[in-house]
Amino acid sequence: MEEQPLCTLSVKDLMEAGAHFGHQTRRWNPKMKLYIFEEKNGLYIINLAKTLYQLRNALPHVCKVIKENKPILFVGTKKQAKCVIKEAAIEAGEYFVAERWLGGMLTNMATIRNSIKTLDKIEKDLTQNSSCLTKKEIALLAKRHQKLLKNLEGIRYLRKIPGLVIVVDPSYEKIAVAEAKKLGIPVLALVDTNCDPTPIDYVVPCNDDSLKSIRLIISAIKDNIINTKKKLGVEIVSPIKTLSTEDGSEEIDIAAGDDNRKEDLLAKKYDSNEAN
């Protein structure tokens, strides 16, 4: 008998994270009625027993995707989700979109690959051809580099269609969901009471506006990915990398984040070029 994925979460854990709080009753989607426990003080309360049941039912598919050697794509671009999504994907060695979903990220990968090639060329210029550039040129390249990296860093090394897309708030990420469905990619989503669960293959009803709720559920999914990979002896490789400078004296973390600081680091690194 195949070993079942581990889910140590309890209804109490979910309640303490505020996962049961849905949206105001006037903002609900009737298709979520199945997952609603009651209405209280103008809010819908999510049935956490069903949340736990749905999550436990979804985890075997997550593990199956890993066993089939298919990539998983985490998507969460709204404020409450982006940090959680990015951290979980990096820890699990999977891919992510945490800033902005660019149309065609799944359905028009050729165009996205061209943007990634541009990013690669800029990095090559910054690391290998810096002696031919002025400080101003380096600063401009660094700025463009960060703009591209911010949107593409999580899928830069994604070489094939994902076997699963994990979404926080499908109403917010409707383009990502639509592209996944067009390609026949299963979608697992954290779904609040205002969402339409119809296009979602694995619905996990919960408060998708609470950082604690998102972190708790995404962490449970991430932990199962990591555990499955360890059991299979699969190496966990971060989807982002470090940019090495030409002389190899210093490495600059190129994960998007503090754009101004990274631009300064890149420019300062090559200050001497103007003098040469």
UniProtKB/Swiss-Prot annotation:
Alphabetical list of InterPro entries matching this protein: Ribosomal_uS2, Ribosomal_uS2_bac/mit/plastid, Ribosomal_uS2_CS, Ribosomal_uS2_flav_dom_sf
Keyword tags: Ribonucleoprotein, Ribosomal protein
GO cellular component, one term: cytosolic small ribosomal subunit
PROSITE patterns referenced in this protein's UniProt entry, alphabetically: RIBOSOMAL_S2_1, RIBOSOMAL_S2_2
One record GO biological process: translation
GO molecular function: structural constituent of ribosome
Family membership noted in the UniProt record: Belongs to the universal ribosomal protein uS2 family.
PANTHER family: 30S RIBOSOMAL PROTEIN S2 PROKARYOTIC AND ORGANELLAR, SMALL RIBOSOMAL SUBUNIT PROTEIN US2M
Protein name: Small ribosomal subunit protein uS2
Species of provenance: Chlamydia caviae (strain ATCC VR-813 / DSM 19441 / 03DC25 / GPIC) (Chlamydophila caviae)
